[in-house]
Amino acid sequence: MLYNSTQNAAEVVSAAQAIAQGISKDGGLFVPQEFPKYSAETFNELLKLDYKGRAKKVFADFLSDFTEEEINDCVENAYTKEKFGSDNPAPLAYAKLNGKELNILELWHGPTCAFKA
């Protein structure tokens, strides 16, 4: 999969280049040229997996220049109980607001207390 800069679509890089570079030369962010399309069947299969399993599947689709082994190693080393305080890096919390049930995905766990992939 290839990635373009949000500031200049002519700047095209691989996933590995986008990760290593971080931000494009023109200050833009890298975004995929295309997004994988998931069927209902694929979504149902993802539901059967834990967080790490889902991450491995999605990363494999977006990071096509990495091997399965590289992705597995990265996921296993990134989402550890020691780093997140739990085996589930992004737990769901449940709440009610004005009589409506809400599902809240907690993305602040982990060393950065910020966004998770």
Features from the language model and the residues they span:
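PLP-dependent amino-acid enzyme catalytic core
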Residues: M1-A117
